[in-house]
């Protein structure tokens, strides 16, 4: 392991202790400095991104980079506006550090507080998306977490430029510790980072299925993330057709390269003849490749719609991240739910229905981190969920699930305030009893 890698991590770990106690006022000043710096340095960011895009175009020609990754790589003025708005949204969020989550009296003058605190040092490993840097850095800063960033080599110039702009703004703010945010740039550094479980408290990988699986399988550090976004919409027989056409179109076409776009459309057989032909026309006019099961293929072929492809069994398990959609007809809502729970990735799935009992069954039985009713799966996003931004989407069955904002970057500690009590007084034949009484007290109010 290169010593400079370990020294960066150790420096960030030390800075994480200081960062955990920085005041809300100072953190917000640093965040505003970040926003202003991005606005001021637009040209530098766009110039750096242009270099990455030029190199990416060559890699795409050689088949080494997909169009989906190229799309995620591109930075524009409007994307910079989004970065700035995202940071300022985080400023508006309540500082979650030091919140009293519960208070319990164990006995008179022996009070136990459960208080929120930062995780510590977080490693964020991501592919192709330079906007991850300001998005995650702002959330980690506000929640008091030091962060190591490792972006994909295809975004090296963009990541480096944005990172340097932001860190300069942060470290020029009085009261902010130096070294809390670090950047790694080579592929070899990933393996070094994965081995530093003595210092790094959490890893958040953002990228392809294979990429996230690789991270999970090669580290002892806890990993927050999802391996893929195989999302579905089920169109029920009790449906408002205009709603179904609009929502299903948006869920695939609005931005197909992201993990909350649908990959499979399930349609109740009783509504297929009425719903599917127009839906297919809309998709085909938008350039979507349709991979149909036997029944949907026969229905659309009979209507003279083309081009069509036949779905294979493999298609039900594929995340396309592109203008490709699998279509399957089902007999019942149970069949749809079983298909989703078998082939889905527990990310985001939806139902279009006007029937309350179908809605309740679907939301109860679909095992996904977000379940949509008569709304696009594309809403599964930290910003849209009012979190300011997100560090990632988790399909893990832990405390943080779905789009993870600042609340997923916090843990808690127990603080016990006493007046000389000892356990011996609460043991043995004449043991004092515990009161175990819940109190409405805040640790921050204690003198």
UniProtKB/Swiss-Prot annotation:
GO MF = glutamate-5-semialdehyde dehydrogenase activity; NADP binding
Enzyme class, spelled out: oxidoreductase
Source organism = Methanosarcina barkeri (strain Fusaro / DSM 804)
EC numbers: 1.2.1.41
Ordered alphabetically, the record's keywords are:
Amino-acid biosynthesis, Cytoplasm, NADP, Oxidoreductase, Proline biosynthesis
Q: Which GO terms describe its biological process?
A: L-proline biosynthetic process
Which family would the database say this protein is a member of? Belongs to the gamma-glutamyl phosphate reductase family.
Which SUPFAM superfamilies does the record associate with it? ALDH-like
Intracellular or extracellular location(s): Cytoplasm
A single cellular component GO annotation: cytoplasm
Q: What is this protein called?
A: Gamma-glutamyl phosphate reductase
Which pathway does it operate in? Answer: Amino-acid biosynthesis; L-proline biosynthesis; L-glutamate 5-semialdehyde from L-glutamate: step 2/2
Please classify the protein's predominant subcellular localization into one broad category.
Answer: cytoplasm
Which cysteine residues pair off into disulfide bonds?
Answer: none
* Catalytic function, reaction form: L-glutamate 5-semialdehyde + phosphate + NADP(+) = L-glutamyl 5-phosphate + NADPH + H(+)
Cited function: Catalyzes the NADPH-dependent reduction of L-glutamate 5-phosphate into L-glutamate 5-semialdehyde and phosphate. The product spontaneously undergoes cyclization to form 1-pyrroline-5-carboxylate.
């Amino acid at each position: 392991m290169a010593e400079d890698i370990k020294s960066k991590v150790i420096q960030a770990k030390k800075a994480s202790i200081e960062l955990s106690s920085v005041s809300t006022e100072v953190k917000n000043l640093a965040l505003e400095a970040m926003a202003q710096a991005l606005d001021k340095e637009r040209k530098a960011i766009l110039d750096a991104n242009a270099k990455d895009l030029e190199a990416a175009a060559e890699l795409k020609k050689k088949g080494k980079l997909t169009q989906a990754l190229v799309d995620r790589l591109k930075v524009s003025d409007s994307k910079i506006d989004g970065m700035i708005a995202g940071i300022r949204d985080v400023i508006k969020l309540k500082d979650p550090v030091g919140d009293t989550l519960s208070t319990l009296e164990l006995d008179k003058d022996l009070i136990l507080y459960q208080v929120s605190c930062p995780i510590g040092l977080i490693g964020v490993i991501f592919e192709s998306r330079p906007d991850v840097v300001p998005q995650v850095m702002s959330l980690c800063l506000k929640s008091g977490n030091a962060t190591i960033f490792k972006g994909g080599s295809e975004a090296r110039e963009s990541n480096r430029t944005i990172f340097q702009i932001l860190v300069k703004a942060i470290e020029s703010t009085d009261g902010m510790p130096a070294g809390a945010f670090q950047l790694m740039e080579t592929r070899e550094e990933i393996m070094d980072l994965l081995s530093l479980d003595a210092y790094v408290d959490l890893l958040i990988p953002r990228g392809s299925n294979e990429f996230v699986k690789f991270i999970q399988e090669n580290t002892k550090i806890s990993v927050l993330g999802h391996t893929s976004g195989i999302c579905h919409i089920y169109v029920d027989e009790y449906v408002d057709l205009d709603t179904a056409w609009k929502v299903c179109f948006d869920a695939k076409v609005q931005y197909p390269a992201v993990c909350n776009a649908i990959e499979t459309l399930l349609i109740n057989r009783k509504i297929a003849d009425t719903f599917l032909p127009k839906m297919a026309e809309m998709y085909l006019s938008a350039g979507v490749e349709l991979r149909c099961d036997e029944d949907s293929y026969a229905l659309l072929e009979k209507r003279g719609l083309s081009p069509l492809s036949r779905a294979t069994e493999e298609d039900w398990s594929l995340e396309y991240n592109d203008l490709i959609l699998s279509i399957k007809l089902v007999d019942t809502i149970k069949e749809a739910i079983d298909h989703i729970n078998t082939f889905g990735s527990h990310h985001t799935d939806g139902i279009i229905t006007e029937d309350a009992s179908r809605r309740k069954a679907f939301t109860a039985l679909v095992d996904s981190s977000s379940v949509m009713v008569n709304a696009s799966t594309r809403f599964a996003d930290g910003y849209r969920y009012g979190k300011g931004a997100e560090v990632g989407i988790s399909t893990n069955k832990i405390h943080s699930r779905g789009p993870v904002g600042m609340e997923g970057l916090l843990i808690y500690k127990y603080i016990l305030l006493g007046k000389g009590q000892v356990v011996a007084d609460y043991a043995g034949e004449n043991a004092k009893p515990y009161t175990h009484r819940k109190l409405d007290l805040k640790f921050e109010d204690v003198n």
